[in-house]
Design a protein with these regions (language model features):
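Class I S-adenosylmethionine
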Residues: 1-29, 33-45, 128
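Conserved S-adenosyl-L-methionine
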Residues: 42-52, 73-74
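Conserved acidic E/D residue at the C-terminus of a beta-strand in Rossmann-like folds
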Residues: 54-60
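S-adenosyl-L-methionine
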Residues: 65-113
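A short SAM/SAH-binding and catalytic strip from SAM-dependent methyltransferases
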Residues: 116-131
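Conserved beta-strand signature within the Rossmann-like core of class I S-adenosyl-L-methionine
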Residues: 117-119, 146-154
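A short glycine-rich, Lys/Arg-flanked "PGG" loop and its adjoining helix->strand segment in the class I
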Residues: 130-147
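Class I S-adenosyl-L-methionine
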Residues: 156-178
Length: 178
């Protein structure tokens, strides 16, 4: 449940809800387990938000791994089929998951479009240093709408300075409530 609480806090509460918009273009760097996508889908249905969700993943998890993930059982057992669908959707095609939620899983590393919210969910800088490069942040910043939000777990000073150097205003937040 720790990963679930952190994902809700960092991405849903601190970014998606903080955007204050009813129609939101979301970019996720790192689809991974699909947890952030699933939480965003559920939020869109509950709050009536129209979400255009683009996610990048160069190394998708295999079906034998994703089928074992139990997030729906912990969050919304009636949504198990939606969670499975998020993983089974074709890559590089926009798919309407519901009238309010469109998913575009990209198996690429170049950005297109303008985003209101960015979930930067790459592995830690020590594990995946190439993802935390100033060049990547500059590219993301150039695709962010005015007043757009980038949210990440990383609180390292070095990463904060890189974000600021390309134009981001950086704010720190306390961790998730216990």
């Amino acid at each position: 449940k720790g990963a679930l609480a952190e994902a809700r806090h960092v991405y849903i509460d601190s970014a998606l809800r903080a955007s204050g918009k009813k129609e939101i273009n979301v970019l996720e760097i790192g689809f991974g387990t699909g947890l952030n996508t699933f939480l965003t889908f559920l939020e869109s249905q509950e709050k009536g938000l129209r979400i255009n969700y683009t996610t990048f993943e160069l190394y998708p998890l295999s079906p034998d791994i994703t089928e074992k993930l139990n997030y729906p059982a912990l969050i919304a057992p009636s949504s198990e089929s939606i969670f499975a669908l998020l993983h089974q959707c074709e890559w590089n095609q926009k798919i309407a998951i519901s009238p309010l939620f469109t998913l575009y899983k990209r198996h690429a590393d170049s950005l297109e479009g303008i985003y209101d919210v960015v979930y930067f969910d790459a592995f830690a800088p020590e594990k995946q240093p190439e993802m935390w490069d100033e060049k990547i942040f500059r590219e993301i910043f150039s695709h962010l709408s005015p007043g757009g939000i980038l949210s990440t777990y990383c609180a390292k000073g070095e990463i904060r300075r890189r974000l600021q150097s390309v134009g981001f205003t950086v704010e720190g937040f306390p961790g998730p409530p216990n």
